[in-house]
């Protein structure tokens, strides 16, 4: 599967304690250059829990009732969680469902810079 930065995908996400995994949505944040040459990619998680949006840094709302939310391909309004940053083998990606808009990706980038101190 050819990945691009900003792709919304469903993948087998490992539990933080390493005991298993569950299919979850995520956003590809790795550069297109590296997505072309590597068998792994860097993603941030997406959660259905939106209660921290606007209250805590690192959470960006994806409202499925908006055109850009629909383009993301999610089933319900969700939050991108930039604290859920993972490097995963691309074999774990099960489905490509959409793309984040440039505006949402700019918000993700800003939160990643803040989280990583860049």
Regions found by a protein language model. Name each.
Residues 1-118:
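Conserved functional hotspots at enzyme active or ligand-binding sites that engage polyanionic ligands
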């Amino acid at each position: 599967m050819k990945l691009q930065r900003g792709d919304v995908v469903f993948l087998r996400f490992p539990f933080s304690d390493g005991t298993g995994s569950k299919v979850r949505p995520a956003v590809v944040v790795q550069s297109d250059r590296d997505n072309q040459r590597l068998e792994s990619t860097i993603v941030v998680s997406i959660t259905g829990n939106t209660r921290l949006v606007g209250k805590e840094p690192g959470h960006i709302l994806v409202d499925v009732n908006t055109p850009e939310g629909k383009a993301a391909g999610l089933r319900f309004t969700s939050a991108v969680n930039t604290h859920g940053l993972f490097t995963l083998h691309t074999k774990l990606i099960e489905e490509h469902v959409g793309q984040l808009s440039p505006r949402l990706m700019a918000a993700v980038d800003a939160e990643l810079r803040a989280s990583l101190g860049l």
